[in-house]
Amino acid sequence: MNSTFKVVFNKARGALMVVNEATSSVQAKGTKTVIAAAVTALMAGGAMAALPSDGVITNENLKEVGTTKLTSGMGQTVTIQTNGNVSQLIEDLKAVKDAQEEAKVAALRKAFGYDKEKNHSVMVGVTGGWNLMDETTAKIAAIGLLTATQDAEVVKKFASQTGYKVDDTLNLTGGYLDQTNSFTSDRETSVIIGDVDGTSSPIVLGVVGGSNYLSVSKNNANIVQNAGSTVTINSGNVAGVVGGSLTVLSPHDISFNGEGTGAEEATRTQLFTSIESTALNIGGKANVGGFVAGHAGIATNGSKIDSEVKNGTTVNIKFNDEGLDPLDGLVVGGVAGNVVVATGKSEAKATTNGQTIVNIHNGEVMGIVGGGAAVSFDMGGTLGFLLGSGSGSATTQSDSVIMNVGAKSATAALMGGGIAVADANGKNNGSASSTAKFVELNFEGPKALNENDKVKLHKAATTYLPKFREDIKSQNFSQLVADFTGFADQVDIPGVHVANLGGGSAIARGYFVDDEATGTATANSKVDSVSMTFNGGYNVATAAGGLAVAHDKADASKAANQTNATANVDKVNLIITGGENILFTAGGLAYSTAEKRDGASLAKATANVGSAEVLVSGGTIDGLLGGGIAFDNVNGKATNAVANTESVTIEVTGGEINAANVDPITKPIQGEHAGVPSRGSHVHQVAKTLGKDGANVAILGGGVASGAGAESTIQNVKLLLNGGKVNDNVFAGGLATLGG
């Protein structure tokens, strides 16, 4: 490979061009050098891995495998039983950050590689299926890789891993895609990380159960797996898991030495991907950060992605009951459905047919979304210039979601529905929608928590939450890890379930700062029916409806309602048979805020619940609300946050209901009470008013509104106190405060 190639972006033509510098020249003016950055960075430590015949990779055979990068099974089970040291990885990543530009590639090689002593390695990109690219994209990647590494053998290994052969002039032949740019497989795919006994402790960054597909050309494609995928994580530390396929579509006009690719141009470059079903099993002695049980797709530059899981997704979390270290058994951040991202005026849609099932047997589990996640955002800047300006349209759909939360687990921030996030700037429009037909959440736990554990929980919250804010603000990642380690150790108390949401979330963020900014940011979440059952446990802060958040950065001259977040739940059933339950509402949550809290922003957050039925037959409840909660942090002249509930029926046949002890909330959260109230002051005042030092509320039939532009409405309230014991005050109506 004696030729020297360069990838450039021609502004005048609006196209990527690949030139042979030995035969062509490109004027520097009006061009920008662009090397397939994602591939090059990923490949900084070497070529793709060659899978051993038995499919098992260990520290001992990594030298024969050749690299730690981009292992693919192509239908054969891939088993990773390497060993890695998290502290070493953090130290190496810090070295990458601190390195001079010319030394960053070498630092990356060290961070994402393996040592000669065979006691530390980091695996990057493990795939049960295939690494797929169309020929144009593979050639762009090969040129970028050759430019970065100056190593022809690396390029040849890369090409072989994507099904191609490459000659000395970088001509490619072969590939896994057929003549119609499609790929179909009837083979099941499987990835296994670690072992149940924990004799291996891999570090793995990026696991895909299905296949990867990357394209920068304007070729339409179909990626179909007529079988299921399974990812099993038994030990080690794993970040970034996709149960289905991972697809990235960023179409460009491609020119090789001034000649086009010959591809027919479509109105929108389209990609369809499908898989039969997916299963994600997390257990043993593992830790997992960030998973998507279904597909993950990113559409840019005016493209369109359509993904489906034909027959459901399953997530099982069950760690070893004995022999766990204090920091084993941790899962942070996950989506049980599909995830789609759209930017650059693109469209992305994903559907999960059948049931989505999440079983949490034990461990510490935080931030799990039962439905799908749809994200549209306005990239802007240099990346926006390359990947398409403007926001996009993203949609996810789920049939039914069932989440079973076991008595041996400690959980926080579980959500039954999906999440929709829309972001837009200037004249651009961004929309996101996430829907689910039926959501069921079942919580188990002890009848009561002992007082020592309660003190331990409250102390952990007041000690570490301020530290997290400071660590993030100062970008001190190593200290954040240390503080999170201490926090996780303190809150690992079985049967504690904090911040539970029955419906989905809608988050809209607008940046419309002048009269010419006529765009919109619209996020919608919808669940037809939610059923939540609490049979036991120490359950704190539960809303059966959805969550709507609207954030705006508007000048006083803006008068259009451009930033809207709406979370809808048609029907709610909230059933409490046991446990200790603190601050429950059958309604939804609406929160609106703005960077300029001068009363001019008309960002709007709306949480709607149709009918809500609450049945209390056992356990204790400290603070039960029938309606929703609306916080307006805009200080608006108009209504910015609304929580609507059509009808509520609360029936008490057993158990005991009291006013809440809100000291754990009001003591650490004070806020600004003078002038324009802050977010903290709204929380503080509402909690104080509800609690024993305020109105001493056991049951509030209506909802809560806090802030000048907040409303909480309810049409019909029915309270049936047929049994049990109510020790404090009962109000059929609602509560309103100014928040400061």
PLM ranges: what are they?
Residues 51-206, 211-240, 245-367, 373-584, ...:
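Surface-exposed loop/turn motifs in large extracellular/passenger domains
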Residues 4, 8-49:
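Gram-negative bacterial Sec-dependent N-terminal signal peptides
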